[in-house]
């Protein structure tokens, strides 16, 4: 009995212990901590370095992630604190750092590589101009370039100076060389005649180098015979085998503007990751990879010597002075848009079919039109707005094309000397108000005769081009639905092919939202020299900003 009394507690204890062990959950597996992305906002010309995402992660453990945007759009995002990035990587940061606001946003910066602006001239045209001899080419000046443009002998492609770094730096190069000043320029120093002469040769605009290269390949020898861009881009184009003939690279004697690709820290909290990435980018192995992969010049002389066979020895000329004066930069952009560039003439083809009433699409379209006729004074807003001397036709359509209405923005006052931002005249404000009122009155009903509307608009632009050949013509069409009235895409292709040759100089840009047939729209822009903008994931007013950079 005593034995039983002793055994029972022991058995209970053992059973309890066994039960406890059986009920215990196994320890959870050790969780692998998530690697935070190190977000970098880069300008679009840096898409060729995207393989660095994987390379940096393997070498440093930092999960690098690029997002890409236009120069001025990205600059504005940094200036306003809306970049949503830990770092920025631009071709240069001279505009960004030209005032205290930009300087306050950038915590650290490291120059990574170099590429000077060059003038690429088709070899046969270089011979005609007497520029083919290396000794002669070495003595050419920005004035020689501007004179050839003025005389119609140099017809070039260039990214929009108001939205892209390379376009802006080329224009600044002309201004700096014409001033003959060794020190920084002011807005009053700008030689207006030099700008006017240079821009007479500007025949192929666009927002980025990729689009311009595609168009240059198609139009080399007919519409254009030169391409002004970074040396690295022109060398890559020469090596592509896609050109009708190679480009001779000219580096004007007075000097050039050079992109130094600063890698800039925006978020102090990510300093450690930034330093790891910057150190990797400046390492000898990465500098060699960048030079060979992108044809940009290493920042280290000893590394540059190892790739000397890839890069023209003439490229690194005197650096033209860049003024930190924001008034000069803003005044130059404003004068380019409103005074010096070939004025814009465009037809906006507006889908007013019944489907546009739903999903807030009508409101979005109306707001977008009102936006370009509004008073947004931001950097990109100034670029997107209707400019002085601009001519605009608004062409609604539904079952059929109807109600074409024309607007013309008057010219502003012209400064006798230098450049400066100017307020809108009362006459301009009246025209902008008329455009906004037109948008307010749009009614949505009926079907979608998209290709009829685009075709009629091209005919209108052709007729206007015959009367006023000095404008930059384009058609911009907005639609949310598949074409279900009038011409099919095949009908359009047939009829387009029968139009006069001059129509090839009028690009058609399509804005896609809703259920529009993306395949057909891409087929249309492929033959008309434009591109498709997708507004299904981006606000339409933001798409408008992008479109304006191509006009």
Region roles according to the model:
Residues 344, 349, 354-394, 424-430, ...:
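…and closely analogous acidic/polar surface helices at protein-protein or active-site interfaces
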Residues 21-153, 157-160:
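N-terminal segment of the mature folded domain
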Residues 181-249:
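Ligand-binding pocket segment of bilobal, Venus flytrap-like solute-binding proteins
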Residues 110-119, 196-199, 241-267, 271-275, 280-302:
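Periplasmic-binding protein-like
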Residues 479-535, 545-546:
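VWA/integrin I-like adhesion module and closely mimicked acidic/polar interface patches used
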Residues 296-348, 352-363:
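Acidic, polar low-complexity linker/tail segments
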Residues 402-404, 411-472, 509-519, 542:
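Von Willebrand factor
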């Amino acid at each position: 009995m005593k034995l039983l009394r002793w055994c029972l507690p022991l058995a209970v204890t053992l059973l309890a212990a066994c039960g406890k062990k059986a009920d215990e959950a196994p320890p959870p597996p050790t969780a692998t901590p998530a690697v935070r992305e190190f977000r970098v906002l880069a300008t679009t010309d840096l898409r060729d370095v995207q393989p660095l995402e994987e390379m940096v992660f393997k070498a440093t453990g930092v999960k690098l992630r690029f997002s890409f945007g236009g120069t001025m759009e990205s600059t504005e995002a940094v200036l306003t604190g809306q970049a949503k990035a830990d770092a920025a990587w631009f071709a240069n940061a001279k505009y960004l750092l030209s005032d205290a606001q930009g300087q306050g946003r950038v915590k650290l910066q490291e120059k990574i590589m170099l590429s000077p602006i060059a003038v690429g001239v088709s070899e046969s045209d270089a011979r005609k101009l007497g520029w083919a001899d290396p000794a002669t080419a070495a003595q050419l000046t920005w004035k020689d370039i501007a004179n050839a443009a003025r005389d119609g002998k140099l017809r070039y492609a260039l990214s929009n100076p108001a939205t892209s770094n390379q376009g802006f730096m080329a224009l600044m190069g002309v201004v700096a060389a014409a001033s003959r000043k060794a020190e920084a320029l002011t807005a009053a120093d700008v030689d207006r005649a030099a700008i006017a002469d240079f821009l007479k040769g500007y025949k192929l605009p666009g927002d980025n180098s990729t689009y311009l290269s595609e168009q240059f390949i198609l139009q080399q020898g007919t519409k254009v015979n030169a391409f002004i861009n970074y040396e690295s881009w022109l060398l890559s184009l020469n090596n592509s085998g896609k050109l009708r003939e190679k480009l001779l690279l000219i580096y004007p004697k007075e000097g050039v503007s050079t992109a130094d690709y600063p890698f800039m820290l925006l978020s102090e909290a990510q300093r450690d990751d930034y330093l790891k990435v910057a150190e990797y980018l400046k390492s000898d192995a990465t500098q060699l990879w960048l030079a060979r992969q992108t044809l940009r010049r290493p920042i280290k002389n000893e590394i540059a010597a190892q790739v000397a066979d890839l890069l023209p020895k003439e490229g690194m000329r005197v650096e033209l002075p860049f003024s930190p004066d924001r008034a000069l930069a803003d005044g130059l952009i404003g004068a380019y848009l409103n005074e010096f560039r070939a004025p814009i003439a465009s037809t906006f083809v507006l889908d007013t079919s019944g489907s546009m009433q739903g999903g807030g699409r009508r409101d979005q379209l109306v707001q977008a039109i009102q936006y370009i006729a509004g008073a947004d004074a931001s950097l990109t807003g100034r670029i997107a707005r209707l400019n002085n001397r601009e001519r605009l036709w608004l062409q609604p359509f539904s079952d059929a094309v109807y109600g074409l209405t024309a607007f013309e923005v008057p010219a502003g006052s012209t400064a006798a000397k230098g450049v400066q931002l100017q307020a809108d005249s009362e006459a301009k404000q009246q025209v902008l108000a008329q455009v906004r009122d037109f948008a307010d009155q749009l009614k949505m009903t009926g079907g979608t005769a998209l290709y009829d509307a685009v075709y009629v608009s091209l005919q209108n632009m052709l007729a206007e081009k015959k009367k006023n050949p000095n404008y930059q013509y384009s058609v911009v069409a907005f639609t949310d639905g598949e074409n279900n009235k009038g011409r099919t895409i095949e009908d359009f292709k047939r009829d387009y092919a029968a139009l006069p040759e001059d129509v090839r100089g009028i690009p058609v840009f399509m804005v896609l939202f809703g259920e529009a047939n993306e395949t057909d729209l891409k087929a249309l822009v492929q033959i008309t020299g434009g591109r498709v903008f997708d507004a299904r994931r981006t606000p339409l007013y933001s798409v408008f900003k992008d479109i304006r950079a191509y006009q």
